[in-house]
């Protein structure tokens, strides 16, 4: 996904998977060399790296968000923040995003009543492509 869209991927430990060559290939990340991937020890280190890189607005994608992901207006450099597949984002992180960027910076993906959530990779793909679409796709081929 990152190689195809040009998005940078920032992972925060602890990871729920291995980044060794065999695991990465099995997960479909065998062209990781084409993507910008950084692993951070904690969210504070990730945040500092993103600030140094000139990150824009932060968006928290979370069940129970204030508005739908397709209602947001994304800009180049924005940060899409997803939690772990099982637990989502910590409440303190969601509160921090609300405080810094407003309640409407917490987004949700609509789904049918009674369903909990999409898996993480599908959610990331959906929101990333919407942000990319809004910014003209930037396709170079």
Language model feature labels by segment:
Residues 1-141:
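Post-transcriptional modification and biogenesis factors for structured RNAs
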